[in-house]
From Swiss-Prot:
Glycans are attached at N41, N353, N576, N715, N786. CDD domains: LDLa. Keywords: Coiled coil, Disulfide bond, EGF-like domain, Glycoprotein, Secreted, Signal, Sushi, Toxin. GO terms for cellular component: extracellular region. Disulfide bonds join C464-C474, C468-C485, C487-C496, C711-C752, C739-C767, C780-C814, C784-C820, C795-C804, C829-C847, C841-C858. This is SE-cephalotoxin. It is found in: Secreted. GO terms for molecular function: toxin activity. Residues 709-769 form the Sushi domain.
Length: 1052
């Protein structure tokens, strides 16, 4: 938009002064010099012509001067355009930033500045804006070409986040300008402004810019150093890198300031305080200047170090290449000097003691070449001719190698030497050398083998005699007649001759007028009203049409109708101009004709009477605004949000009447001031000042009067009547109160009453606390067993429990179902004991009544059970014992072998009887074989066969074979352990698949019977059973080989 664009234009004019040392400007007294001094060819000495590099400082200075000239040219172009059109807003002085940003604050006459700016003006601004930024880009591009080795992005890593934020903002702003140039519709331009405002705020651009300033100019807490200073430290005395860093950071600062100005102008806020941004630019300028000056003062010491480094890193190259690199590096890094580099056998004996040697030094036997270097320097702008040689303050006389080509010379064109001034061509040179003591004789002896270089041709006089006009500090570059001015903060120019100042004319008065309005009505920002850009005259007409049937208001309108019509006329022609319905000439002519017939003082006096009820028959409190508030309250509930909205709109319009009319008249003054002589201009400026003073006084009066004729703002927490803010109530207003959230309003009604001349509410309303309804009961805290459930209620009020009596929570017991159920993993005993379901049938009497281990419930092996054992290797064979009545009674043993009386893979009920020899009774060692007790894997057991009560035998394996034999004398009477005396009859019953198992043995389990000699093994049909170590000593993986030792158990 116009406001922002011109703010940006002025910003160039305000800020480019900071670039007068960016990089520092160097000025010299430069004598006339021939364009080129021809040098004779030499067979003894290589003297390649060294072209003086264009210095970065000179290039950057030139570019910035062009950029500043573009700004001035653009301003002049716009002035010329305005002259052709008679008058235009942009003619008001050079301080367009203050003027336009102020005009943009209020929408009564000027909403967004794009409204009053022609497309052609926007085009000029847009072209200039992008053009100058393009020039700044070209600076960086040029620096890139001068030094491709500088990794700027790596060096400026900490700047990258802020840099991209600013860069994106600038691109958005340029895009906005371009669209505005093409768009003529006022409302669409406003939308573009709003879009930029949202982009600026959402991306926190101003915060990023402030962070950037802080990052650059504030000392780091950890390193105790500022980032910008650290960047300069990284660059050392490399002038190219120093300048690149400075220009890059300066460009980010500059564009960031552009964005802030544009944002404030688009949003119609007061222009930001520029001091912060100017100080930041001054800061980096001064740091940059100081660093460059330090480099100038230490150039000679730095150059010696550079030569050593170059010779060391280029040891593999010839001396010519090394000298070329030295000359190139010194000329690049220290461009304020011209450099001559010479390799010699030696200097003349007394050369070092000569008074003519203050601008050269010798470095002896440097590097692997063992060469002696003589380095001579002088100011790069110093030029002389051979006849001026006696003015030199330095002459280096050197002994060279005549034919060995070991001596080399690199001299710039502005430095005299033997080749450019041979003795036979310039007798003055010979005479000058001959007269110089103490090495005259030595020169005469070695006339043909010496080479000389003369330097230090400074113009007479002090190059700082101008003193930077008293507005800065002047410093002379060592060994030159060049100087550099360090300007004070508010001065600029080559010799600090320009003072930075802003014109304080009508634009300042408009700013004061806006500030007065904001202070009077405590308005922080007018953005919303601005973006609406509403026509105040039309709004007043709508209000009049709505209530013209009301007697009181009609009375006031009739009384002041003519004065309101005059204000309406001013607003009408102002808006017509803003919408380009009339030309600027027509606006000026109509305003001039109107004001010639209607004195300004009288117009505003009548407006004041209407607003303040100060007319002859007016009554305080019965003015236009208070009467209108009564009309609204009669149609709507008093103090409700709709009432407040409508009353606020009227308040805003009335409060801006004075401001809008004054702005319009000041705009007219500013147009006319371009064509007045100094005397009339001074008189008009005084009128403008008086207009502003009177308007500010009246606006303060309006605010005080409306405050006096209104009760204080009705701001009560939770009160639903939110429409009675400051200045929106009136005497006699009655308000029915209510609160939100179920709270009770106390009292229920209040009134705005007069108490001793002051309006106040008849009571102080409040919303008292009360309990809300109880919530529903919560679910039981548990899914089974005894639990609790609760419900709550809230204290509706400001201080919670302090205002409400009684508990906020209730708790009661609840029961869902018994937790001791199988679905919850539990088992309930008959004695009501509850155990885990996993403990049922585990062989332990957990219920203490054997209920959980009953035979009907638990099918596992018990002591006293009859069992049969099927061999796993011979699946049809069963463990069998032999004993019959025919055997002699005194025969105590019987055979143990495999048999297949049982025909299948399990025992049928009849086979338990018919195959009695293949079933054994088993006893466990628990409670010494107590009948009915569970037998677990790992328990000791004993087995016996009983034919009759008198014929029984116990199963035994000894020593390696198994049989039946008598140890105990009767069945069921077996004593385990050492005291029993029948150890060979005891076996461990082991889970064949899990030796560590301690579970009860169940029908169908595969077992191993083992004693201390081994485990029981079947050997095939009708073969005796024996014992071996299989499955006892072997690993688990050997189970397949021990299948004959595995037995499947069956229980009757």
């Amino acid at each position: 938009m116009m406001g922002t664009s011109r703010c940006v234009i002025l910003l160039f004019a305000l800020l480019l002064w900071a670039a007068n040392a960016a990089p520092p400007e160097i000025h010299t007294t430069r004598p006339n010099v021939p364009e080129e001094i021809k040098r004779p060819n030499s067979t003894e000495i290589e003297t390649p012509a060294v072209k003086q590099l264009e210095t970065p400082s000179i290039f950057l200075l030139t570019t910035l001067e062009v950029a500043e000239a573009d700004v001035d040219s653009t301003l002049e172009t716009m002035k010329d355009r305005n002259k052709k059109n008679s008058a235009k807003l942009s003619k008001i002085g050079n301080n367009m930033k203050s003027l336009l940003s102020v005009f943009s604050v209020f929408g009564g006459f000027l909403s967004l500045l794009s409204v009053v700016t022609t497309t052609s003006d926007l085009q000029v601004i847009s072209d200039m804006f992008t053009g100058v930024n393009r020039k700044l880009d070209q600076i960086n591009d040029k620096l890139d070409k001068l030094d491709n080795s500088v990794e700027l992005q790596g060096l400026l890593t900490n700047y990258i986040p802020w840099q991209y934020s600013v860069k994106n903002g600038i691109e958005k702003l340029i895009e906005t300008y371009k669209k505005m140039v093409e768009e003529t519709d006022m409302n669409k331009r406003r939308l573009m402004a709003e879009n930029f405002i949202l982009f600026f705020e959402n991306n926190q651009i101003e915060s990023n810019i402030n962070n950037l300033i802080k990052l650059t100019t504030t000392t780091d807490a950890v390193h105790q150093n500022m980032l910008f200073n650290e960047l300069l430290d990284e660059a050392g005395c490399d002038i190219i890198r120093l300048t690149r860093i400075y220009m890059h950071v300066r460009r980010i600062f500059y564009q960031g300031t552009q964005l802030v100005l544009a944002y404030n102008s688009f949003k119609q806020m007061d222009p930001p305080e520029m001091k912060k941004y100017l100080n930041a630019l001054i800061f980096i300028r001064n740091m940059y200047q100081s660093r460059v000056w330090h480099c100038k003062e230490t150039t000679i010491a730095q150059s010696k170090k550079d030569i050593k480094d170059i010779v060391k890193t280029n040891a593999k190259f010839g001396i010519t290449t090394v000298l070329r690199k030295i000359n190139s590096e010194l000329s690049r890094k220290y461009p304020w000097y011209s450099w001559s580099i010479v390799t010699v056998k030696k200097m003349l004996a007394n050369q070092r003691n000569s008074t003519l040697g203050n601008q050269f030094y010798e470095m002896e036997a440097v590097g692997p070449h063992g060469s002696n270097f003589v380095v001579i320097w002088q100011g790069f702008k110093e030029h002389s001719q051979c006849e001026d040689i006696q003015k030199a303050n330095t002459i280096a006389v050197l002994t060279i190698c005549k034919s060995c080509h070991q001596s080399h010379v690199f001299t710039p064109s502005n430095m005299l030497n033997k080749n450019t001034c041979p003795n036979n061509q310039y007798p003055q040179v010979k005479a000058f050398i001959d007269r110089r003591e103490p090495f005259r004789d030595e020169i005469q002896r070695k006339k043909s083998d010496v080479f000389w270089v003369a330097a230090g041709f400074k113009a007479p006089g002090n190059p700082c005699n101008h003193g930077c006009n008293g507005h800065g500090e002047c410093k002379v570059v060592p060994y030159t007649d060049q100087f550099q001015c360090f300007c004070h903060g508010n001065y600029e120019g080559k010799m600090c001759q320009k003072k930075i100042q802003m014109k304080r004319d009508i634009s300042k008065l408009i700013s004061d007028l806006q500030t007065g309005y904001k202070n009077a009505f405590n308005v922080p920002s007018l953005t919303n009203i601005l973006i609406q850009g509403e026509n105040l005259a039309k709004q007043l007409k709508k209000m009049i049409q709505r209530i013209d049937n009301q007697f009181e208001l009609t009375h006031i309108l009739v009384k002041y109708i003519s004065d309101l019509q005059k204000l309406d006329y001013i607003l009408k022609i102002s808006f017509n101009y803003s919408k380009k319905k009339i030309t600027v000439d027509a606006f000026s002519r109509r305003m001039k004709a109107f004001l010639s017939l209607n004195p300004v003082d009288f117009i505003f006096q009548q407006l004041s009477n209407a607003i303040l009820a100060e007319g002859f028959t007016d009554i305080q409190g019965k003015d236009f605004f208070n009467t209108f508030k009564r009309m609204i309250a009669s149609n709507r509930d008093a103090c409700t949000a709709p009432y407040g909205n409508e009353a606020t709109i009227l308040l805003e319009r009335l409060s801006r009447l004075d401001l809008t009319a004054a702005e319009s008249i000041l705009a007219y003054y500013s147009f006319e001031s371009n064509y007045l002589n100094p005397a009339n201009m001074k008189r008009m400026l005084e009128n403008a000042k008086q207009l502003v003073r009177d308007s500010k006084r009246r606006m303060r009066s309006y605010a005080r009067y409306w405050e006096r004729t209104s009760c204080p703002p009705l701001n009560v927490t939770h009160l639903t009547q939110t429409g009675c803010g400051a200045l929106l109530s009136f005497e006699g207003m009655k308000v029915k109160l209510s609160c939100d959230g179920g709270r009770a309003a106390v009292p229920q009604n209040i009134e705005c009453v007069n108490v001793n001349g002051n309006l106040q509410w008849s009571a102080t309303p409040k919303c008292e606390s009360s309990w809300s309804r109880w919530s529903k009961w919560s679910a039981c805290a548990s899914t089974c067993g005894n639990a609790t459930q609760s419900r709550r209620r809230r204290c509706l009020g400001q201080s919670e429990s302090e205002k409400c009596i009684g508990p906020s929570k209730q708790v009661r017991k609840c029961f869902v179902e018994d937790c001791c159920q199988e679905k919850y993993g539990k088992f309930k005993c008959d004695n009501n004991k509850c155990i885990s379901l996993s403990r049922v049938c585990d062989g332990n009497d957990d219920c203490r009544n054997a209920e959980d281990e009953s035979k009907s419930r638990c099918k596992y092996l018990r002591s006293g059970d009859r069992i049969a054992l099927r061999n796993m290797a011979y699946s049809q064979e069963w463990l069998s014992v032999q004993y019959t009545d025919a055997v002699q009674a005194d025969l105590y043993y019987g055979r143990a072998y495999l048999n297949h009386c049982i025909k299948g893979d399990h025992v049928t009920s009849s086979e338990w009887n018919s195959c009695a020899g293949q079933s054994l009774l088993i006893y466990g060692n628990y409670e010494n074989g107590k009948i009915g007790k569970a037998i677990r894997f790992g328990d000791k057991i004993a087995m016996y066969y009983r034919k009759t009560n008198y014929h029984y035998r116990w199963f035994i394996c000894y020593p390696t074979y198994c049989m039946t034999y008598t140890c105990p004398k009767k069945a069921g009477s077996f004593t385990f352990g050492p005291n029993g005396g029948c150890d060979e009859y005891e076996f461990y019953i082991i889970n064949y698949n899990d030796k560590l198992s301690r579970d009860p043995v169940k029908p169908g389990d595969v077992i191993t019977l083992a004693n201390n000699r081994g485990s029981v093994k079947g050997n095939g049909y009708n073969r005796n059973i024996n014992i071996n170590d299989c499955t006892v000593k072997r690993a688990q993986d050997d189970r397949i080989e021990c299948n004959a030792n595995a037995w499947q158990i069956f229980i009757k």
